[in-house]
Amino acid sequence: MNSRTKIIGSMCIIGTTVCYGLIPSLSFLSFDAGVATETLLFNKFFYAAVLMWAYIFIKKIPFRMDAGAAKMMLVISVSYIGVATTLYISFNYISGSLATIVSFTFPAMVIAIEMITGMEPVRIMKIAAVILSLLGLALIVWTPDIKGNITGIFFAFLTAVCYVGYIMGLASKRMKKENSIAVAGYVLLSSAVFNCIRCALSGEPMFAAGKVQIIYMFLLAVICAFTAILLYCIGVRMIGPGNAAIINTFEPVLACIFGYFIIGDVLTRNMITGGIFVVAAVFIANLPSKGIGLKPGA
């Protein structure tokens, strides 16, 4: 890997991390503008899916899968729908910064499952990552100012659980040969269909109305979904999934910074300390690994 390739690849992953870090703040700005959760998710995934599939067809990226891969793709899609749904439910109770921190306990969960099942050997650094993640989560949960928001923390934790299913599905042998952009296209499409049904059942409008709402939907779909995924795929090809995962560790940090400056999120001492523990755990978890696959932002 030459220095130019490394710099460009790293910049792509940094761009992805910034895009993902903006998701909570832009989502809350959308809520303030009067966009319902169901409408937001449908618009975000629908427009991103249109762009992604246009890219797939223009670039002639292979997207057909055999029966085995198609079944695993269904598991991955359902898991990701769970990620987006539970994360946005948590937004009803806690800040986007806090929800992002809690959801980032998923790498420690993956490590724990891999060690318990024998998929990965037991290593001190891996155990340290799990312990740090649990300590960070405990500090966040025990923050005095958020005792009334255990429901939000619970749903953010469910987001992490769904991420585990999603990540392990991506890492399965059946999906190794599939193009990551095609996989992202299916994930976005299935999420759009699911939230279209949610809009129909809830009575919420499928499309945002008004200039401000449309701008926020455009930013979430084009920047936080389509561009973020595309940059991630390009970056991974250039610097490898391991290096990409390490850079992506800083997503919850950026989410907190953006939340604080853009929408005025409150950051308590326990939240900051717990967040540092979680970020450290993710960093340790990814340092010796080969990466955890594609992670389209929720």
PLM feature spans:
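Glycine-/small-residue-enriched transmembrane alpha-helix faces in small-molecule transporters
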Residues: 1-39, 43, 86, 145-172, ...
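Juxtamembrane helix-entry segments on the extracytoplasmic side of multipass membrane proteins
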Residues: 5-9, 34-42, 65-70, 142-165, ...
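Helix-helix packing/entry segments at the starts of transmembrane helices
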Residues: 11, 42-43, 99-105, 170-192, ...
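Specific transmembrane alpha-helical segments of multi-pass solute transporters/efflux pumps
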Residues: 19, 24, 53-103, 139, ...
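Hydrophobic/aromatic residues within transmembrane alpha-helices
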Residues: 30, 40, 44, 90, ...
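Transmembrane alpha-helices of multi-pass small-molecule transport proteins
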Residues: 32-82, 109-110, 161-169, 184-203, ...
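C-terminal transmembrane-helix exit sites in multi-pass transporters
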Residues: 51-57, 87, 106-131, 253-273
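Hydrophobic transmembrane alpha-helices of multi-pass small-molecule transport proteins
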Residues: 52, 122-142, 195, 249, ...
